[in-house]
Amino acid sequence: MARVTAEDCNKIIPDRFRLVVLATRYAKLLNYKVETSYSKKEKRDKPPVIALRRIAAGKVSVAQLEQDLINSLCTRNIIEPLANQDDLEDVEEKFDYLPEVYVGEDYSDLDDQIFIDENGEYDERDK
């Protein structure tokens, strides 16, 4: 079995930390079957070995791998601002149930608080 060393890959990606991150990303893509073109020799190897060999051989676009990694780390959820006043009132109504609890530094204010149990009944906890 031929071994792939970091020195082989360092010719393509000089920074070892960057190499590890990019090789890991490419190995995950191989593992998820995103790229399915394996040669005969590669069929028995595991994805990290295949990734390192392809990076060392220059078969992988480093710029494309970096862009893919950045895209995978970006947040895809965009929070839309509330458009009209009705939406704002609906959101405020959802938070009306929250009680105002003020707690002092020594937590003595909690001694006089009334709690509600799972059944919705008042439960004054022991002090």
UniProtKB/Swiss-Prot annotation:
Listed GO CC annotations: DNA-directed RNA polymerase complex
Alphabetized UniProt keyword annotations: DNA-directed RNA polymerase, Nucleotidyltransferase, Transcription, Transferase
Source organism, top-level taxon: Bacteria
GO molecular function: DNA binding; DNA-directed RNA polymerase activity
S-S bonds: none
Example GO BP: DNA-templated transcription
EC number(s) stated in the UniProt entry for this protein: 2.7.7.6
Catalytic reaction(s) noted: RNA(n) + a ribonucleoside 5'-triphosphate = RNA(n+1) + diphosphate
SMART domains, per the entry: RNA_pol_Rpb6 (SM01409)
Signal sequence residues: none
Family the entry assigns: Belongs to the RNA polymerase subunit omega family.
Subunit-level organization: The RNAP catalytic core consists of 2 alpha, 1 beta, 1 beta' and 1 omega subunit. When a sigma factor is associated with the core the holoenzyme is formed, which can initiate transcription.
Record function comment: Promotes RNA polymerase assembly. Latches the N- and C-terminal regions of the beta' subunit thereby facilitating its interaction with the beta and alpha subunits.
Family annotation (HAMAP family): RNApol_bact_RpoZ
Name of the featured protein: DNA-directed RNA polymerase subunit omega
Annotated organism of origin: Rickettsia canadensis (strain McKiel)
